C-alpha cells in the first residue's frame, strides 16, 4: 500500500507498490501540473513508524486513453526518483499474467481492497489502514445498478446491502486477489456512486486489460 501526498502533505489517493521504482495508481488522481510524492510504510497514522518513507515522483505516466468524464482507462504509473527500501510494511504486490488474471483470479469469490480513505461518505479519513474483503460482482448486475457506464476496462465489486466499500481518499489504491497464499494485483480503486450505498457497487480498473501497457 502506498499513499499519494499533495504539495501540502495531505494524502488524497492510494497506490500499489509494483517494485522499488514504480507505483500503480489511478489516472484520476494525477494532476500533471502539481508536485507529487508517495508515502509508503504507514499502517497507523498516529504512531511513529520506522518503516515510513516519503519519495518524490520523477514522472507520472497517465494512460493515453484515460477519459476524465467516464473514468475509462483509469490507470497511471508513477516512477520514483529514488528506490524504495522494502521491509515488513513496504512490500510489492505481484503482477499476474493476463490469462491467469482473467481465468482464475477474477473468478475467485473475493478480492481485497485497502486504504486510508473516509469511513463513510462525508466522514473523516481513518487513522489506521482499513483492509476489506469484498466480493466480485457480475458485470450485468453492476451495469443495472449504476447510472454511469461500466466499460470493458472496468469491473465491479462490493455488497449490495452491507455498506463495506472503498470511499473518498481510497482512489488509486489496490484491489488484490489472493491465490495459493500469494496476493496479485487485480484492480485499481476507481469510482462509485457514493460509498457503500444500498444497491450500488464500487467500480475498479480491470488491470488485466492493461498488463501489456504497465
What name fits each language-model region?
Residues 1-20, 70-71:
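A conserved glycine-rich beta-strand in the N-terminal activation segment of trypsin-fold
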Amino acid at each position: 500500500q502506498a499513499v499519494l501526498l499533495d504539495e501540502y502533505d495531505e494524502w488524497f489517493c492510494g497506490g500499489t507498490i509494483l517494485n522499488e521504482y514504480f507505483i500503480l495508481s489511478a489516472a484520476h488522481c494525477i494532476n500533471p501540473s502539481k508536485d507529487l510524492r508517495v508515502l509508503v510504510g504507514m499502517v497507523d497514522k498516529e504512531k511513529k513508524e520506522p518503516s515510513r518513507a516519503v519519495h518524490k515522483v520523477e514522472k507520472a505516466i497517465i494512460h493515453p486513453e484515460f477519459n476524465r468524464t467516464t473514468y475509462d482507462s483509469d490507470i497511471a504509473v508513477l516512477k520514483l526518483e529514488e528506490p524504495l527500501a522494502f521491509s515488513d510494511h513496504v512490500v510489492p504486490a505481484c503482477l499476474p499474467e493476463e490469462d491467469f488474471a482473467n481465468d482464475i483470479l477474477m473468478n475467485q469469490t473475493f478480492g481485497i481492497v485497502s486504504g486510508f480513505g473516509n469511513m463513510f461518505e462525508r466522514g473523516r479519513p481513518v487513522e489506521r489502514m482499513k483492509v476489506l474483503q469484498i466480493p466480485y460482482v457480475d458485470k450485468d448486475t453492476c451495469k443495472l445498478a449504476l447510472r454511469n457506464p461500466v466499460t470493458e476496462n472496468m469491473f465491479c465489486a462490493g455488497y449490495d446491502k452491507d455498506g463495506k466499500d472503498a470511499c473518498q481518499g481510497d482512489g488509486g489504491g489496490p484491489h488484490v486477489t489472493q491465490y495459493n497464499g500469494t496476493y496479485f494485483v487485480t484492480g485499481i480503486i476507481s469510482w462509485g456512486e457514493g460509498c457503500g450505498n444500498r444497491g450500488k457497487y464500487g467500480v475498479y480498473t480491470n488491470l488485466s486489460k492493461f498488463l501489456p501497457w504497465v
